[in-house]
Amino acid sequence: MILLGVNIDHCATLRQARYRQAEATAGGPIEPDPVTLALAAERAGADGITVHLREDRRHIQERDVWRLRESIATRLNFEMACTPAMTQLALKLKPESVCLVPENRQEITTEGGLDVTAQRDRVRACVEAMNAAGIQASLFIDPDEQQIELAAQLHAPCVELHTGAYASSYPQPTSRTKEFQRLRMGAARAHELGLIVNAGHGINYVNIAEVRTLPHLHELNIGHSIISRALFTGIDEAVREMKVRMNP
């Protein structure tokens, strides 16, 4: 069975669109609350909760991750830039897992996989720190053989394959087939190297029918499509429907 990690970043995006000041000046309850949403997602069957605390704090805030750490019953997957400050925060937070992702202040959302080659020493230091602390470290990378092999060399126990290029090419059959084959080969190579294989980015209620057939999948991290569907159906139904489509 493929596990579902629900990314709740965009609940915080909606909150921050209205409330950017301190809670004391908000004039009442601040909604929507990401922690409340996370608990509802868990009740609906989410196997874990994923949040990305960006360095620019554009959506999830540090207080959110600490409240989540204290509140949720499943697993906390903490997405973070590979920086000394974030590494120290993660070691204090002690989530079940961290996922190292690239960040660009001009991007709307994460635009590609982490370039492990360019940040080899920094990634190694972070992975070693997480391994020593008993926190599972995952690298969010494109399905590129060189990146996957380097992840294994740096002793990362897990990779999350970036499915964004596949999702973007979905309407074009030729490009879609090419990108899906890259994902298949990447998943197979990661598995050969003993890595846990996760995937995420751009997965929705349509392309999940194909994504779920990728070999050796352990977990999918899905956010925007679930939060979008929840606006119409509620978070319970949105999570349950995705779980059904992932594991029919």
UniProtKB/Swiss-Prot annotation:
The active site is at 52 (proton acceptor), 79 (proton acceptor), 201 (proton donor). GO terms for biological process: pyridoxine biosynthetic process. Keywords: Cytoplasm, Pyridoxine biosynthesis, Transferase. It comes from the Bacteria. The record marks 160 as: Transition state stabilizer. 3-amino-2-oxopropyl phosphate binds at residues 7, 18, 202, 223-224. It catalyses: 3-amino-2-oxopropyl phosphate + 1-deoxy-D-xylulose 5-phosphate = pyridoxine 5'-phosphate + phosphate + 2 H2O + H(+). GO terms for molecular function: pyridoxine 5'-phosphate synthase activity. One of its GO terms (cellular component) is cytosol. Pathway: Cofactor biosynthesis; pyridoxine 5'-phosphate biosynthesis; pyridoxine 5'-phosphate from D-erythrose 4-phosphate: step 5/5. It is found in: Cytoplasm. 1-deoxy-D-xylulose 5-phosphate binds at residues 9-10, 54, 59, 109. Its EC number is 2.6.99.2. It is an enzyme of class 2 (transferase). InterPro entries: Aldolase_TIM, PyrdxlP_synth_PdxJ, Pyridoxine-5'_phos_synth. Belongs to the PNP synthase family. Homooctamer; tetramer of dimers. Catalyzes the complicated ring closure reaction between the two acyclic compounds 1-deoxy-D-xylulose-5-phosphate (DXP) and 3-amino-2-oxopropyl phosphate (1-amino-acetone-3-phosphate or AAP) to form pyridoxine 5'-phosphate (PNP) and inorganic phosphate. This is Pyridoxine 5'-phosphate synthase. The gene is pdxJ.
